[in-house]
């Protein structure tokens, strides 16, 4: 499954549009709380374990979106957008959403 942030696929013809597809994942309260605690503790460095959790959440959302597109008969998703948003009563969870347009190209 080809995923791209652009509205076209260079050198390819889009033959069918299937519509909007999306995938979501939520990082639980403890991971999110620990994430910000780790950020406060880091000075001039990177929090590898927290980046790993965010990367995994992003990949899960992209896979869910891709699977949805494949079930529709698409072989690509164009105009892919990733959003990160706090959710929950006190904003204690992080939701990662991937969305785009499912298409078939040749």
Curated annotation (Swiss-Prot):
> According to the lineage, what is the superkingdom?
Bacteria
Gene3D superfamilies the UniProt entry points to: Hypothetical protein apc22750. Chain B (3.30.110.70)
Instruction: Give the InterPro entries listed for this entry.
Output: UPF0145_dom_sf, UPF0145_YbjQ-like
Cite the Pfam families for this sequence.
YbjQ_1
Query: PANTHER family from the xrefs?
Result: UPF0145 PROTEIN YBJQ (PTHR34068:SF1)
Q: Which family does it belong to?
A: Belongs to the UPF0145 family.
Indicate what this protein is called per its UniProt record. Answer: UPF0145 protein BDI_2732
- In which organism is this protein found? Parabacteroides distasonis (strain ATCC 8503 / DSM 20701 / CIP 104284 / JCM 5825 / NCTC 11152)
């Amino acid at each position: 499954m080809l995923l791209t942030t652009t509205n076209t696929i260079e050198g390819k013809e889009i033959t069918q549009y299937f519509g909007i597809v999306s995938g979501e994942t939520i990082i639980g309260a403890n991971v999110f709380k620990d994430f910000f605690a780790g950020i406060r503790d880091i000075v001039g460095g990177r929090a590898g374990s927290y980046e790993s959790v965010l990367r995994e959440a992003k990949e899960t959302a992209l896979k869910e979106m891709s699977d949805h597109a494949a079930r529709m008969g698409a072989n690509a998703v164009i105009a892919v957008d990733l959003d990160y948003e706090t959710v929950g009563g006190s904003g204690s969870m992080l939701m990662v959403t991937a969305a785009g347009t499912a298409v078939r190209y040749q």
